Amino acid sequence: LRPAVIRPKGK
């Protein structure tokens, strides 16, 4: 899983 998945920008 990519690190971006841990902090999703899509609220």
UniProtKB/Swiss-Prot annotation:
One of its GO terms (cellular component) is extracellular region. It comes from Pithecopus azureus. This is Hyposin-H1. Expressed by the skin glands. The modification Lysine amide is found at residue 11. It is found in: Secreted. Belongs to the frog skin active peptide (FSAP) family. Hyposin subfamily. It comes from the Eukaryota. Keywords: Amidation, Secreted.
